Every structure is written in C-alpha cells, then in structure tokens.
C-alpha cells in the first residue's frame, strides 16, 4: 500500500544554484520525412500505419529529438471500454481510435533515454533524458485547430532533476508492512552466496504449466476500473488518461532489470457512471480493497480462455484513502495474490500522472514483492537505494535499474514456483496501450491540477524533473507543495532533452540502439546441499552477453541447471529415520509461540493433505496432536518430495529423480524394494480375514523388510462405517492406529522406520493402509469389530525378501502360484509328501518379546520349545546342553537432561528473570521430546534474578 507524503514550501522558494526556469512554453515541430501528414492524431482520423515519427522540441538551451514509433501492445485486441450506470453505452469505437494515439521511443539517440507520449489532442506524455524527467502537454488555452498545425501549437514543457534546497522528508507511501514472510526467505535463499539475478525471455505464445528455472513470457491480463469520482473529475479524457497511466506502468514491467519478461495487457476498461453500479468506495483503504475484490470477482469470466478474462483488476478513485495509521495512503494491494481470482486486485488513489508509478508499485505487491527495505533483502543484497520501484518512499526512479535486485529475485521465485501459471496464455485480442510518454500529453499545469486540484499551478524555479512542486494554500497563504513524485516522463527539460524517470536526458533514435539479450556462460556449480544421502548442486547463467537494452528482447530458456552429488548413504540411515524427519526433529521444543503446544513438543513430518505445490515446504505436525505448521519455507535440497516417491526437492520445487538418487535418472524400485530390480528377489504374501470376534482381532504379522504393503478392508455390502476398522501395532505392542477403541475418520500418515504408511481414514467404503518402501520394523495388523458385528473382509498383500536357500519345489502354493497366508500361517493344503528319513528333534526359539523397561536395565523373554520332525512338542528328545536362552538383559541408557548456560537477567535493575536452554537427549546424543525424560528430575529452567536497586 502506497502512502502519500506531502511537503509544503513557501511559494517564493527557489532551488539553490538554479539559474534557469524549470518550464518553458514550446512548439513541437515534426521533423520526419512525412512532414505533410498529420502531426497529431484526433479520434476518428485515419491510421498512419507503423511509420516512425520525429519531433523536435527546443527548450532549456538545447534541442530534443523524439524518435517515436507506434506502440499499443499493452491493449488487447478485444479491448473495450464500457460505462456501467447512467447512461449505459459501449465506447468501442473510441477505444479503437485510442490505439493510434500512443507512441514510445527514445531521445537524441541516447540508449538510456525513454519516451512515452500520446499524440491525440497534442503532444502529451513524458520522456527522460540524461538524469532529468520531462513532461509535455498542450497549454490549456490552446485550441484544437492550433494543435494540429505543422509548426504551431503551444505546449508547456516541464523539467525535473535532482532536488536541491530544502524539502520535506518523504514518508512511506505504502501501507504494506516492510516485513517478511516465509516465501520471501525461500525466494532469496539461492542468492545468499551471490548477489546476482537470473535471466528470462521474449514474447512467444505459450499455454499450460511453466517449467521450473526457465525464462518464459508472461501476460498480465488486466481490468481497469474508474469510479464515479474519476468520471466527474476527468470527463471525456478519462479513458485516454487511464491508458496513459497503464502504458507507463507496462513499460516499467518490460524493463530488463526485473529479470522476467512481464507484459501488462489491458483487456477491458470499466467507467462507473454512478456509485450504485460499482463497489462501495470509502476512505477505509482496506475495506475498499475487500469490496472491490469481491465485486470484480463476480464480473470476471469463468474461463481464462475468454477474451475478456482478467488476471488482475485495478480500481482508480479520487477518494482520499486512509490506511491503518494515516490518510496519506495512495494505494493498497494484497501481497502474493496474482492468479487468485478472489484477491488479485489493487486500489489506486489518483493523484495525477505519478499514479502510474503507484500502479506499478502495487502490482509489484500482487507479484509478492516486498518493500526494498525489508531486513532479508538487505542481508542478501546490501542496503538498497530508495529510487527503485518497490521503495516505500518512492521519489525518483533509477532510469537504468527501476527494479532492485531483491524485487527481481522474489518475482523470479514467485513465477518459478508456479504462482504465475495463469499468465502463460497470450491474449487473443490485447488492447493497445499508449507508448507516448505522458509528459507529451499533460502539461505541468495539468499535472499540478491532477495532483492537487483545479487552480494549482507549477511553482517557479523548480529543479528539472525530480519533484513536481505545485501551488496551493495553507492557512490562507500561498505555498508550494509536493508529493515527492517526479515530473511525468516526456516533459521537456531543455533543448533536445526531456524528463525520464526523474532525470533530464537527451533524445535519441530508439531502433538504432536496440540490443537483444543473450546468455552468458554457465557459472561453476556451487557446493553440495548435503554431505551424504544425495544432495544437489546448482549452476546459473545470466542474460548478460549482452544485457538487453533499449527495449531489446530478454533471453529465453533454462537459467538454472542442477545435478546430484554425495549419493553415498548416510551412516545414520540405519536408524530408519528419513532426512525430512531429521529436519522436523531439529525444531523439537519449539512451540511456535502458541499456548496450544508445550515446550516439550516433538515434530514429525506431515504428508497427508499437503497440496502438490507445498510438497517441498517443511510442514511438520506436533506429535500426538492435529496441529501442523510450516516450520521452514522449503526443505533442504535433496529431500524426498514424499516418502513413497523418488523425486527430490530442488529450491522448493519437486524434481523427478531415479531410485538411485540421481536427478534425471529413470531407475525405479521394483516390488521388492530393490532399485532397478526385476521383481525376482522377493515373494508375494497374500491373505484374507473374514471371521472376527468382538474387539481387536489379529489379522497378520508383517515382518521387517516387507515392501509394497497393501491392506484393504471393504465395507459390508459397500457400506461406509460398517463397524469394522483396521488397527496397527508396533513390535512393542503400542498402537500406531485406531487403538483403545478410538478410530481416525480422516486420512493419516503413519511414520515407521524406513517407510510411511498411508491410511485412508474410516470415511471410505474401502478402508486402506498402504506403503511402497520396505519397512525396517515388524508390524501387526488387526481389525477392530464392534457394533452389529457385520463380517469384515480384510485382504492383505506384501512382498518379502527370499531366503538364500529357499527351495521353491517344496514351497506350498495356491493355484495362482503365490504363497497363501491365513492369519500369518502358511496354508499346507498342497504340502509335498515328506521323505522317510526324518531329521531329529530340535529346539525352536520364538521372537524376543519387548523389553520390560523402556530404558535402563530390563529383561526380554521368548518361548523356547523342543519339536520333533512332525512339529510335536517333546522336550526329552532335544539336547538340554544346547537349549537357547529364554531371557536376556536389555535396555538402553535412559534419556538425560542437558543444560545450557543461564541467559542475562531480563532487567538491568530490580527483579527480573533468567532462563537457560534445556534439552532431553537420548543415547548417542539424539534430541528427544521432553516427555521422554524423567519429568520428576527436570532441572529448573526459569529462575528469578535480582540486580542492583533501580
């Protein structure tokens, strides 16, 4: 949100060192070969084609030669202006005539100059030349016939340069807080080791989803709305005035310093004849924005392919807007809402031609750009000057780099993250926006009246181009006042010069110095994001060989490439924890500053319910609760996008990779969980459970190493909620799912060692529990049967590694060739006849049970039986000396409390408090949740401190 800062000076103030007036009355002369043609266009005149025009303006002891060419590319072919209210009429004919008005170009063949003017009703617009900005417009008392004659037609040319002498301190004109959000941190992270941007492209029709790290043209289809106050103030010139503002904003977005090819395209202009037909506009800027966003959403077309569909909407009003703390507000918009039909909109308080800069600034917020003075921008790019578009105190635009490096980096990440995919379709009928500088259409006097009201005049002795000082009254006295905006581009500032972006510059030929950009060589690959387990290295190239200039095309194609590195497994991978789990655990003890969570909170990854766009954010759930948060804007490069996928995250985007960890590899896991395998190293185990008893019923024990697990419970006769529910326990007998007669109705992710099981929830006709990757711990599947005891139908299948000496000829099989498991007991219906020479009896030991304690010294037990060859028990037949152990010691050291140093006292005198970090550390130094340590022995974490008396 832009805020307005008005400085007031006495009328007699004169800039120190200024010896020449800051405006002159001039007569533009057309100097191109077709000197017999029309010199200015009027509505209804014939089109002169795409020929170039040259105008000479002599002022300020120099000649300005404006080399102009038609430029209406910011108007969609289907552009139309429509009145809503009384009278109701379409003005398409007038809109078509306006396409011929707008020209753009350069001054005196100067590469850094700039001109954007309208030739309708005289020369009106702005241009910049050698550090000064010029605004030109016909004198108000000049008749239309005079303005059409070859060498007649008085115009007012105003020059604005750097401000000299006393001036008011500019205040922020934008109410958007100069803070940061996770998206900004993510956007700037790649730039921390360097302070350069990335490249982009030129125009070409595209559609669909954008590729990551690729420069692609974007087309911002725009609705422009003017309320009743604008209609009354501007009258018949309103449409031309609005398009002049949008033409200036569009040219700013085509500047290469934004590092992206952004094309502002107006698809429709709505002029509201009375207040009842439009949104409710009040002095409350935030409320007006909300009203306008809701109103424009109802008018927009459903399909992006419709010629009049818009991606963003802009409301212009003369209403004095007020922000939260001041009524100096000039504009307001939500941050990062481009392509959101409900919120991609902005509100602009019209204060004359400088509103073009307000429009570009607020649209920058819609593109997720913060102010340049936010801390994260300064940390990466250093302290930025206050003359870029996203400065909160916009005064004078840097003509060479209107967009800061921070703004370019953030909009690049915003578009690369898929937030600008609605901008990929090129309008079928764009409205042509004026390319003439606004100073050629609006005189200094007109600029003052637009900014400060009827009767306001330019103050004498203004410094050229920098700030527009206009007369006004304060406490009955005549004063000079400014809103810290420069003169409009195109205002003359001397002989052969005009104002451009706050500087007085020479005129030049636009086409002679046009330079298309080209890619430079690839920079070296950076460091690997991980030391083991599969990291990523990045390399970039810049559009700097050469850098596009003077309207030249930007580079198109891939600007960032990547490769895998350090693929060897990490030593800690044997624990079964994923890299994402480790990143979540790093936040253990952080309660997100909410009283809903304790400082003993432990964080685990959240997978279910996460949109594909957010897979590479570090979204973690507080273990044992339903609360989840984005703890980091992106995971470390090389982190798996999902636990059942081999794709990895690169700069916050999910990129395809093979199971070998290599980006671009096509290797896949087979059903056995073997990378690049042929499905021959494992066997399939299937089974069916249909006869339950009330309560929990054992279904199957799934050993460690099982992969491609698929368990389904079909509702009785297709019913949802047939009172049968899947349950899951770990090897310690702890329920991981639907235990203690409490079931989960929603989708859940169950994190186990080595894998994640996806649970469908109970709200489906087919309740499912699935995992693709091998599990590294045994699990037990049960079914909870309650209520009417309708028969369940639980089918399960999974794959187990084959034993090295397994003999397939003696393996029982079902008719389909797969071993069949009935409640974890192999079917022996097809058992092969046993030979007569049976082996002797042997000891058979079961699996070790859980440890009797969770930590410390405990015992484990197991069953040991003597079995003869038919499987019958008979302890006397076995050798007692070789009997296996039935008990053994177990237990790891208990977690301990680890203390840090006390913090300084919270007060410098009197009674305050101090605190020290406290962590629960397990065996091997692993950070645990606090509830896993002995809370009865928890050391004091917070204490009072008393210093000297105050």
Curated annotation (Swiss-Prot):
Entry comment describing in which tissues the protein is expressed: In the adult colon, highly expressed in the muscularis externa (inner circular smooth muscle and outer longitudinal smooth muscle), muscularis mucosa, submucosal glands, crypt, villi epithelial cells, goblet cells and lamina propria. Expressed at perimuscular and peritendious areas in the developing limbs.
Keyword field contains Cytoplasm: no
Species classification: Eukaryota, Metazoa, Chordata, Craniata, Vertebrata
Cofactor or coenzyme needed: Zn(2+)
Name used for this protein in its record: A disintegrin and metalloproteinase with thrombospondin motifs 15
Chain residues that bind Zn(2+): 174, 361, 365, 371
Annotated ranges, domain Peptidase M12B: 218-427
Biased composition (Basic and acidic residues): 802-816
Highest rank taxon of the organism: Eukaryota
Function: Metalloprotease which has proteolytic activity against the proteoglycan VCAN, cleaving it at the 'Glu-1401-|-1402-Ala' site. Cleaves VCAN in the pericellular matrix surrounding myoblasts, facilitating myoblast contact and fusion which is required for skeletal muscle development and regeneration.
Classification via Pfam families: ADAMTS_CR_2, ADAMTS_CR_3, ADAMTS_spacer1, Pep_M12B_propep, Reprolysin, TSP1_ADAMTS, TSP_1
Chain's gene name: Adamts15
GO BP: any one term: proteolysis
